[in-house]
């Protein structure tokens, strides 16, 4: 199986696969139950290409697929397709923020926001001539920082955040002077507030507010490779950061990286001119 997502729900491990639907393992008994899409049977998952599985704050289980979004009904043991976002969207990531908004990231239609308190849906898409819109309709990852701001890593549009008060998106690097790459795979925040972001050009460290503290790490610094995998990251309870890539994964403690601010003095010990002998 091509496993794309894992979600632990008590004693049950939900496994989302590409082309194989969902497998749910009872970790106590080892029993496995399969959920697949069947065109002629109602209330099955909307596609066998399962890209993400997410458990909401109230216990709801959402399943993002290459053909839309559905929600698990534990009473009937089946799935309800959420028609509000349509069936032609590929849902790659789901996250519920601290303000009870469920964010749905898609690879072809921007992002959707669902207010779980009043059941209101909002659709945000990129518009070429409007800098207040999301930077790309191809969204890879969702991330909420410690202040409750939502961030979006995109495929080709770099990194942007959402201003909840102004209802607008803010591009992190509009002049292309900071980020070495516009493909953002995963985002984590360290104890000091800095972001660590994986991309197609290694991992870079940035301060989301002041935009300083920038450092880029590549394969020359010990990374498994310069290319990483979408949404493959983790911050442990100890504060360690994990990032998965195409050749394995890297783990590190961000606080152990200390910038050497000492500028050594320069001494000129020799001067050589081309095509001149020592006597000349």
Residue ranges and their predicted role:
Residues 11-14, 34-36, 61, 65, ...:
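Cyclic-dinucleotide signaling modules
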Residues 7-11, 54-58, 96-100, 144-147, ...:
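Residue-level detector of Asp-centered blade-edge/turn motifs that repeat once per structural unit
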Residues 12-15, 60-63, 101-104, 149-153, ...:
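Conserved beta-propeller blade signature
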Residues 18-22, 67-70, 107-111, 155-159, ...:
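Loop/turn residues immediately N-terminal
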Residues 3, 7-8, 12, 31, ...:
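Short, intrinsically disordered, charge-balanced linker/junction segments flanking boundaries
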Residues 98-99, 105-112, 137-148, 152-162:
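Beta-propeller domains
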Residues 2, 39-49, 86-90, 122, ...:
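Residue-level "micro-hotspots" composed of small/polar
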Residues 26-30, 73-77, 115-119, 163-167, ...:
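Short loop/turn segments that connect beta-strands within beta-propeller blades
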């Amino acid at each position: 199986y091509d496993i794309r997502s894992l979600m632990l729900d008590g004693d049950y491990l939900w496994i989302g696969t590409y082309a194989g639907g969902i497998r749910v393992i009872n970790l106590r008994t080892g029993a496995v139950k399969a959920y697949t899409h069947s065109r002629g049977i109602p209330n099955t998952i909307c596609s066998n290409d399962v890209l993400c599985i997410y458990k909401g704050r109230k216990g709801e289980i959402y399943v993002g697929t290459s053909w839309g979004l559905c929600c698990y009904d534990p009473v009937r043991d089946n799935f309800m397709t959420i028609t509000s976002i349509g069936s032609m969207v590929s849902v790659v990531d789901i996250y519920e923020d601290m303000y009870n908004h469920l964010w749905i990231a898609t690879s072809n239609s921007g992002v959707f926001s669902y207010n779980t308190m009043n059941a209101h849906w909002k659709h945000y898409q990129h518009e070429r001539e409007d800098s207040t819109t999301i930077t790309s309709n191809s969204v890879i990852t969702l991330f909420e920082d410690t202040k409750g701001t939502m961030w979006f890593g995109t495929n080709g549009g770099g990194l942007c955040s959402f201003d909840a008060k102004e209802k607008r998106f803010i591009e992190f690097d509009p002049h292309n002077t900071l980020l070495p790459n516009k493909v953002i795979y995963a985002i984590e925040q360290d104890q000091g507030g800095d972001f660590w972001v994986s991309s197609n050009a290694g991992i870079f460290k940035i301060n989301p507010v002041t935009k300083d503290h920038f450092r880029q790490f590549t394969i020359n610094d010990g990374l498994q490779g310069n290319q990483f995998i979408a949404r493959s990251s983790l911050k442990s309870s100890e504060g360690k950061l994990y990032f998965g890539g195409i050749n394995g994964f890297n783990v590190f403690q961000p606080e152990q990286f200390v910038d050497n601010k000492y500028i050594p003095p320069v001494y000129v010990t020799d001067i050589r001119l081309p095509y001149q002998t020592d006597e000349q």
